[in-house]
Amino acid sequence: MTDSIPLQPVRHKKRVDSRPRAGCCEWLRCCGGGEPRPRTVWLGHPEKRDQRYPRNVINNQKYNFFTFLPGVLFSQFRYFFNFYFLLLACSQFVPEMRLGALYTYWVPLGFVLAVTIIREAVEEIRCYVRDKEMNSQVYSRLTSRGTVKVKSSNIQVGDLILVEKNQRVPADMIFLRTSEKNGSCFLRTDQLDGETDWKLRLPVACTQRLPTAADLLQIRSYVYAEEPNIDIHNFLGTFTREDSDPPISESLSIENTLWAGTVIASGTVVGVVLYTGRELRSVMNTSDPRSKIGLFDLEVNCLTKILFGALVVVSLVMVALQHFAGRWYLQIIRFLLLFSNIIPISLRVNLDMGKIVYSWVIRRDSKIPGTVVRSSTIPEQLGRISYLLTDKTGTLTQNEMVFKRLHLGTVAYGLDSMDEVQSHIFSIYTQQSQDPPAQKGPTVTTKVRRTMSSRVHEAVKAIALCHNVTPVYESNGVTDQAEAEKQFEDSCRVYQASSPDEVALVQWTESVGLTLVGRDQSSMQLRTPGDQVLNLTILQVFPFTYESKRMGIIVRDESTGEITFYMKGADVVMAGIVQYNDWLEEECGNMAREGLRVLVVAKKSLTEEQYQDFEARYVQAKLSVHDRSLKVATVIESLEMEMELLCLTGVEDQLQADVRPTLETLRNAGIKVWMLTGDKLETATCTAKNAHLVTRNQDIHVFRLVTNRGEAHLELNAFRRKHDCALVISGDSLEVCLKYYEYEFMELACQCPAVVCCRCAPTQKAQIVRLLQERTGKLTCAVGDGGNDVSMIQESDCGVGVEGKEGKQASLAADFSITQFKHLGRLLMVHGRNSYKRSAALSQFVIHRSLCISTMQAVFSSVFYFASVPLYQGFLIIGYSTIYTMFPVFSLVLDKDVKSEVAMLYPELYKDLLKGRPLSYKTFLIWVLISIYQGSTIMYGALLLFESEFVHIVAISFTSLILTELLMVALTIQTWHWLMTVAELLSLACYIASLVFLHEFIDVYFIATLSFLWKVSVITLVSCLPLYVLKYLRRRFSPPSYSKLTS
């Protein structure tokens, strides 16, 4: 048999706005004071505001009470076919165009609209209840009369709000005071940015020093804040106290903010409200939900357009055969109404209900627990993926970091030699604690050991100090929290940090003798092997950013007064910061090839004068309102020169369970896997080999670093001469290639069995997805677990988020959410395949059902001199596509050609779907021919066998039509489910029972005769038997691939 010609509709923009903001008209936007601009907010005096601000109301509804019905109807009738059916129904009010009872056209349309309206109403009610619950939460507001209770919706800009532990922050605020002794608080931000690690926040120093919270109302102070924007990771502002002499000004940054939607994890805080309502960071980052339109839906739209063309052609032919006699234009309209069943009005409803079933089945699958379907509109996409783009860290790997290597240049310590590191640390502190009497000079061996111990100690101390980790003490049932914190109880201590890498490093320093036991915003405590506590003052902290790829900290040792600047970061940036050495680059490469994540650690000693000079310039830069980030970075960079290289650290991130067999399954299914990661080249390559993304006997072409067009041209030519090899390329080289040779590069890359892109920025990940879609026209699936994967996930045809240690941001942004990468195999091979095949069968059967009755109408009109008279009227035409055939046809969503275990065992079955065979122009044409044959057979058979009255034609043909549909469903089903049997018997019973009430259309006495029974039996047999024979012969002599596995 020849292959089907897959449907290839034009790829439209994949996302369309499915959520019109009907509940918020444009004129309401001006009520909040126009365009957002910087503001001055006086503490505790909302009446002093210099502009109008929006109410602090959360509103996630699409519509309000008045716009609900018009909004829903508009969203439905903007689709051509729904509008077309509305015009048909309205035409029945014109006497010259009426073909029967009004309900014949209005009931089906009303049913479709009722399903949509009910679904939207349920969603709106749920939204309203959630919004009301959030807006009604009660908070404490500080006023001159004391503390008063206020609802979240009544909070205003300038209010002083008190938020307790485990309470949600109701508005965007500046952090003024905390009840915590350490003068800071922790936030849980997982609902804002998806990250599960707690964030440290610091109050304004000036207000934290006030004796009580009530004193906030006694001072004259204000906050100057930037205009509202979507950036949740940055903030610029200043705090000014005017009643002091001289006035005090402090710069404000992200560390002083409490964004709405976050939760206070420690203590009780007081903040001043800056932004409310739609100006909240969380609201501005929440775009209207958008739906992806699946390729399957586009293909079905193509088919319905073909059917509409057929409808017009058939109507014109009927009128033409009448020689356009009389009022022929009215006849055209009547025939358009008569053959309107050619376009099935129930197709969209059936497919949407099918998608709901597929989503329910996915959620209920016990073999992929925790899987969530967030977009129920595209389950069929899972069955046709050609390119899978995956993140590395946390997706292919566990994101559970284990410290593996400490490298000092001349010596390296692995897991098997950590006791030596511990010995060096112990010897340093035991020597310091002893004050031995004068003795003979040390031997050479002793000097060497002391030198090595000193180097190891400096490295471990730097690792123990340079981080953003905070130890948190919790009650363990024996010791309460306060006592545990006071005694630094090991069993009660938990480390909180913004990255698993940070926790792994601090846990390792604890294992070798240097334990982080305490930290607040201004100090840090380390416990030594001799139970001595080292107190260090934190002078400055420079947090890690994706742009800088490094972090630093300046501390003062309280016992010696020494000031030290510690820094750690990626080798690509640290190589230009540390003093010249001849081993850094080589050893970084060696450790990366072992699959380790490498950090370079360095330090620099500062004199008091050097630090004071730096601090003055740094404070001045932080007070700048314009270009603050650039000025601050410039000041910090003045310190980052000629730093002393201390060590390299290697942390391993192990592969997730069953990653290798899952990738092998995907490869055998014809899916090409690309790994896009921000990690370094050597680490990414090593992980690709370990995961068998690149097979053992496969060559790897490492695309060398290129910086201009000429170099890119030469390297592409070199790559072109390679065959069947995996490609490894860095983000910098990728950017150059896409700038000058986008088409050539993508053409070559698409031919590779696997591609690894390292040092890849989030925007580049999304760009690669977009280019694959444009250049190949194939469906893409993006898999990730972190916030840097969100853009890639949203850009892909099908986004899958993995719930991991980096939070839920990717999971919440994805169409599907899984808990482990290995679940992806079953999601695609079983659920994706079944969803696509079931929807293909369902859509073609619904079309077949409509074409059958339309063919019968065409034959009937032709026989009776092309009269525009309906064959079936009233309840018959409505019941045909509802209670008589709806349940058996819809039961096809439960059908499957092979068992789940077989689909997983033979992923090659998935390849057939990539060619679009289940739904193609060929299969569509076959079903059209089947419909024409069966419709003609039934109608001509009824005309030949009826005896005297017209109602006999109706009875014979309609009964034969119902039985034919039921038999066709039975012949199509490949794996019977008990619900399918119930659907068949229930539909037949409904038809037989309803015959008693159909005396207006059917002769009840005639259908009880033997003559009726044998005529219906013969017609049904002639319409179905040849198709069964053809199906049997095809399975016998040209069986499909799946039948070979089930026979």
Curated annotation (Swiss-Prot):
Its EC number is 7.6.2.1. Its main location: membrane. Keywords: Acetylation, ATP-binding, Cell membrane, Endosome, Golgi apparatus, Lipid transport, Magnesium, Membrane, Metal-binding, Nucleotide-binding, Translocase, Transmembrane, Transmembrane helix, Transport. GO terms for molecular function: ATP binding; ATP hydrolysis activity; ATPase-coupled intramembrane lipid transporter activity; magnesium ion binding; protease binding. InterPro entries: ATPase_P-typ_cyto_dom_N, ATPase_P-typ_P_site, ATPase_P-typ_TM_dom_sf, ATPase_P-typ_transduc_dom_A_sf, HAD-like_sf, HAD_sf, P-type_ATPase_IV, P-type_ATPase_N. It is found in: Early endosome membrane; Recycling endosome membrane; Late endosome membrane; Golgi apparatus, trans-Golgi network membrane. Found in most tissues except spleen. Also detected in fetal tissues. Expressed in brain. CDD domains: P-type_ATPase_APLT_Neo1-like (cd07541). It catalyses: ATP + H2O + phospholipidSide 1 = ADP + phosphate + phospholipidSide 2. Its cofactor is Mg(2+). It is a multi-pass membrane protein. The keyword Transmembrane applies. The chain crosses the membrane at residues 70-91, 97-119, 304-325, 333-354, 842-862, 875-893, 924-942, 950-972, 979-999, 1007-1030. The modification N-acetylthreonine is found at residue 2. The active site is at residue 391. The keyword Transmembrane applies. Mg(2+) binds at residues 391, 393, 785, 789. Residues 2-69, 120-303, 355-841, 894-923, 973-978, 1031-1047 are cytoplasmic. Heterotrimer with MON2 and DOP1B; this complex regulates SNX3-retromer mediated endosomal sorting of WLS. Interacts with RAB5A and RAB11A. Plays a role in regulating membrane trafficking of cargo proteins, namely endosome to plasma membrane recycling, probably acting through RAB5 and RAB11 activation. Also involved in endosome to trans-Golgi network retrograde transport. In complex with MON2 and DOP1B, regulates SNX3 retromer-mediated endosomal sorting of WLS, a transporter of Wnt morphogens in developing tissues. Participates in the formation of endosomal carriers that direct WLS trafficking back to Golgi, away from lysosomal degradation. Belongs to the cation transport ATPase (P-type) (TC 3.A.3) family. Type IV subfamily. This is Probable phospholipid-transporting ATPase IIA. It comes from Mus musculus.
